[in-house]
Amino acid sequence: MISNRRWMVAAVLGVALLAGGRDAYSQEKRAYKIGSVFSVTGAGALLGERMKMTVEMMVDQINRSGGINGHPVKLIVYDAASDVTKAVAATNRLITQDEVDIISGAGNMSGLSLAMKPVAMRHGVPMISNAGARPIVEPIDKSSWAFKSHLTDKEIVGRAIDWWKSKGITRVAMLSDTSGFGTSARDELKLQAPGAGINVVAWEEFDAAANDLVPQLTRIRAANPEVILCWTVAPSGVVFMKNARQLGMKQILMHGFGYVVPKYMEMAGDAAEGTVLVSLRFPVGRQLPDSDPAKKVILDYTREFKAKYAQEPDVYGAEAYDGMLMAFKALEAAKGFDKEKIREALERLNFVGTNGIYRFSPQRHYGLTKEDAVVMEWRNGDWKLLMGAETK
């Protein structure tokens, strides 16, 4: 006859085994939760719209193919409305209420990503930004949970300087907005210009919501630069192009990678013709040589997006595409839900995306280099490649 004590031990073990079985079953069926914060309204809406569409398409595709390591993927997306406060609130909600395993898509604007970063750091949740400002991932000892699918403004500014030097240009003016995006690039040009023999003859700033840049451009005209580099993602960049041509300015007009949006060029009309931009590979993907490893990824993504939405993707959607690839690959490599292992997997990534060859390390939380950037021109309603992306 079984004693009461032995019966109780057996009962406890039985309950534990049942609980363990339920936990194992629960773990087997548990979905990976990926959070995204994009601005699909507000000043950054033109950037965020196709980013959101892209990640929704990708999650649908991976779930139809069986998920990641047999786990389904759940995507949770919030609109930051181009507002820092809303971006931070959305990040807190993703982490504390939705309990996401990773964030891929951090605001789609540098200022928003910079505001979201401390939240991810505080909670120990991997965050992948699609924005450009260098401080998103540096210094590395204060960016352990922050990664990005984009170049930093260090490489983009460096690529602009390469093009200036190839054309014998030495006199440049910079007109940047006062956001984190504009300020970061301004600081970068200050660092790089002197050593490259570039004389920045005028520094001007403007509010991202500005609708008149004539005063700044009048001062720039007096300094007689060869090129005017504007740095913004806001519609005020259209005002820059229109005002410059209205003033009869003949200088080369140039935008950074925040303005690779055909809609913005169309809004500027004839004033945009000949504008030079520094960008990631995607907009000129069809013009890349077949030997470029990113070309096939670009064409495949473009075909998939057009098949689903009956419209063309853009470079911002491509950035979100590469960012979500990062998330998928890291989750697959981590083989579980341990956020530290997911973070470590991100540091080991090496893959080809739409915008180049990504190589990450514990010391480098963005995978692209200056050679992944291109210089292009808006000509006759399309992008024309001026300086290509070298294969690493």
Predicted stretch roles:
Residues 2-14, 20, 24-392:
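Extracytosolic ligand-binding ectodomains
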